[in-house]
Structure formats: C-alpha cells, structure tokens
A protein has these predicted regions:
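Extreme N-terminal starter segment of soluble prokaryotic enzymes
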Residues: 1-5
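A short, mixed-charge helix-start or loop-turn motif at secondary-structure junctions
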Residues: 6-7, 45
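Short polar catalytic/cofactor-binding loops
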Residues: 7-13
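Conserved residues at the C-terminal ends of beta-strands
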Residues: 9, 39, 110
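Cys-nucleophile CN-hydrolase/nitrilase-fold catalytic domain and related Cys-dependent amidase chemistry
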Residues: 14, 25-97, 103
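Substrate/cofactor-recognition hotspot
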Residues: 17
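Conserved N-terminal beta1-alpha1 strand-loop-helix module at the mouth
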Residues: 20-24
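Active-site catalytic loop in hydrolytic enzyme cores
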Residues: 82-150
C-alpha cells in the first residue's frame, strides 16, 4: 500500500493550520497514495476545551469532500472533538467515498512534570477513550494509536 505521511509545525492559529493542511494534502496527492496520514493535533494544539470542535465541523467536512473527490483515504491523526459532554483527542478515518469509517479516542493521556517543574496534563482537557479500534482499507487492516498509547 502506498502511504503519504504529512508532518507540519502546528501553531496557535486554527485557520492557519487548516490552510497549511489543505496545501500539504494537495501536495501529497502527487505521490499517488491510497492513504494519507496526518499527525496528532494537526489542526490545533491546546489545553483549553473551548477550542474543541464537533464531528460536523467544516474542517472535517472539507477532508471528507477531499477524500471523495480525489478517491483517497485519509487518517485525521487527531482532533479535539467534543460530544457536548466531554472533549476527546480523537482520530478519524475517512474512506475514499468521504465517509467516516472509524474513530478512536486516545486512551492514555500524556501527563508529565517537566524538569522545570512545569506540569502538562492532557487529562485536564481530554477524556480518555476506552476501546481499541481497527479499520480496513483496500484489504489492509490497521490499528489506531495516538502518541502515548504505544
């Protein structure tokens, strides 16, 4: 299977990150991939629940339309998705028909005390998932994993 992996430096501006992602996914098509993969928190990295989106957000719809138009599968590494009760660090898989075929909520949050005693706790923002997920693309089986879940 031919894959395209996208890596980008995520800034604090959601719209800027979204525009960069749209440019990079367009560039990735030149490699004729069956699956394009984005990293964790590729549209926004924040420890604030106020920046979460729902699963019908325009950015997700954009990638669904892109997948269908270009007959390509996309793994949206992770996004801060809210279900009105909680916010999850969620990975979504969009198939070449533009349908979300799999979702996975990060299970193991990254909580750490840094050398300078600065504390970073994902668990203050995100609710942990509780289920492992797999998905199939073109006869290949994949498993989701986000960062600390490995």
């Amino acid at each position: 299977m031919r894959l395209s992996l996208i890596q980008l430096t995520v800034g604090s501006d959601f719209n800027d990150n979204f525009e960069k992602s749209k440019d990079l996914i367009q560039d990735a098509l030149s490699y004729n991939p069956e699956l394009i993969l984005f990293p964790e928190c590729f549209l926004y990295l924040s420890n604030s629940k106020k920046y979460s989106i729902d699963q019908n957000h325009e950015s997700i719809i954009y990638f669904q339309n892109f997948a269908k138009k270009n007959n390509v599968n996309i793994l949206l590494g992770s996004l801060p998705i809210s279900d009105n009760k909680s916010v999850y660090n969620r990975s979504l898989v969009v198939d070449s028909n533009g349908s979300i075929i799999s979702k996975y909520d990060k299970i193991h949050m990254f909580d750490v005390i840094l050398r300078n005693n600065e504390i970073y706790k994902e668990s203050d923002t995100f609710k942990s998932g509780n289920k492992l997920e797999t998905f199939d693309i073109n006869g290949w089986k994949f498993g989701h994993s986000i960062c600390y879940d490995l």
